[in-house]
Amino acid sequence: NYLILGLGDVYLTAPCAVPVDPRHRLLSSKYNPARTFTAEGTVGIGGMYMCIYGMDSPGGYQLIGRTLPIWNKFKKNKQFGDKQWFLQFFDQIKYFEVSEEELNQWRADFENGRAEIKIEETEFDYADYVQFLDDEAESIAEFKVKQQQAFTTEVDRWKEEFAAQPEEQI
């Protein structure tokens, strides 16, 4: 589950979210230079943050998937209510795998106001979350060490590749 901590990270109330469980937090760099095109509904990771691109736009996050639109440009989807954006601060997002054909059908249904998005009311209990973090502190710390080692190894590899490039390619 991803917890939305901010909106508008890229454009159009794009969520800035992190996995609730710290052991599920990926750490990645952003592209440099950024892409000139990223399709609307693309899911990306930059640093430890997940974002959904609300419109076709440039982008620098590492791409990990596609999802339904988060921006209701034609105001056809009743689950948005009277807003053009779907997500709110502290909402949680949970993804599930579908085929490309299923995703295309969901997206077409969404565009035409027929998609029914599964929404569950839940409460984020901060005291329970702190207890979870305390209970899992050792495994979380072990994960963070491995995560940082992997990231450092990757950055070092990029530096070596960059240094090995002929000057005219830099």
Residue locations for each model-derived region?
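Glycine-rich active-site loops that engage anionic ligands at enzyme catalytic sites
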Residues: 1-170
